[in-house]
Amino acid sequence: MELKQISSNKCFGGLQKVFEHSSVELKCKMKFAIYLPPQAESAKCPALYWLSGLTCTEQNFISKSGCQQAASEHGLVVIAPDTSPRGCNIKGEDDSWDFGTGAGFFVNATEDPWNTNYRMYSYVTEELPQLINANFPVDPQRISIFGHSMGGHGALICALKNPGKYRSVSAFAPICNPVLCPWGKKAFNGYLGPDQSKWKAYDATCLVKSYSGPQIDILIDQGKDDEFLSNGQLLPDNFIAACTEKKIPVVFRLQEGYDHSYYFIATFITDHIRHHAKYLNA
């Protein structure tokens, strides 16, 4: 699998790089960002995958979150893929900001015309890790995942659908119960069709109820002044209730005065990287 380097910038002793490759799953060219800490020059490091939110590319997280300082300190390789296939020339892919381009929702679409390209779930859990493991100094046994909003949803479902694959999971303002919120209903109806029983396979709150894997410790930060919390897009209470019932440990922190933006993410990113480092470096 050929990788084309798009950029490389020294940052906190390591290198922040962006690559492009031709994706088999998505049948298009895809970019991903990867931060290689200084420790990666001499040893295989754990890998931490970040999934971004609606409208984002691979750039938002690496330029706005300030993740590199903590990643350098803890010796973590941080990988940030794009949020959807790009340039597939599907009718309607650019019609709205919350569906199609920049809004893959980390599902494998089953509905025509999306099912050929929109396979972000398999891309993130299978194709991309294989590519990373083959080309970079990462330890394939030590991986974790986190994300924001739509990507927080993605991180939670990837961890819950693959017991034991990820050492830890965390999220900022995740879409916790997409089968019940407007964003989720729109995306799932488009990608997965009208049969709502299929939607549950990609809903963290539904997945928790049937989870039977090894214990997984979940960290969630949520801004109290997040407009998408107040208008019912995120529904964290439903997820927490399901976790409590299943005795799955969740640290849920409602952060006074914070919104849905990268200013919020940047404030708490070090806490999240520390959370993952605790499990990845154990």
Swiss-Prot record:
Q: Which residues carry this modification: N6-succinyllysine?
A: K4
Domain of life, per UniProt, equals Eukaryota
Query: What is the first-listed, main subcellular location in coarse terms?
Result: cytoplasm
GO BP field: formaldehyde catabolic process
Q: What is its EC number?
A: 3.1.2.12
GO molecular function annotations of the record: carboxylic ester hydrolase activity; hydrolase activity, acting on ester bonds; identical protein binding; S-formylglutathione hydrolase activity
Catalytic-site annotation from UniProt? S149, D226, H260
Positions of post-translational N6-acetyllysine modification? K200
What is catalysed by this protein? S-formylglutathione + H2O = formate + glutathione + H(+)
Pfam hit, one: Esterase
Q: Which UniProt keywords apply?
A: Acetylation, Cytoplasm, Cytoplasmic vesicle, Hydrolase, Serine esterase
List cellular component terms (GO).
Answer: cytoplasmic vesicle; cytosol
- The kind of enzyme this is, by top-level EC class, is hydrolase
Q: Which family does it belong to?
A: Belongs to the esterase D family.
Its biological purpose: Serine hydrolase involved in the detoxification of formaldehyde.
State how it assembles.
Homodimer.
Which named protein is this? S-formylglutathione hydrolase
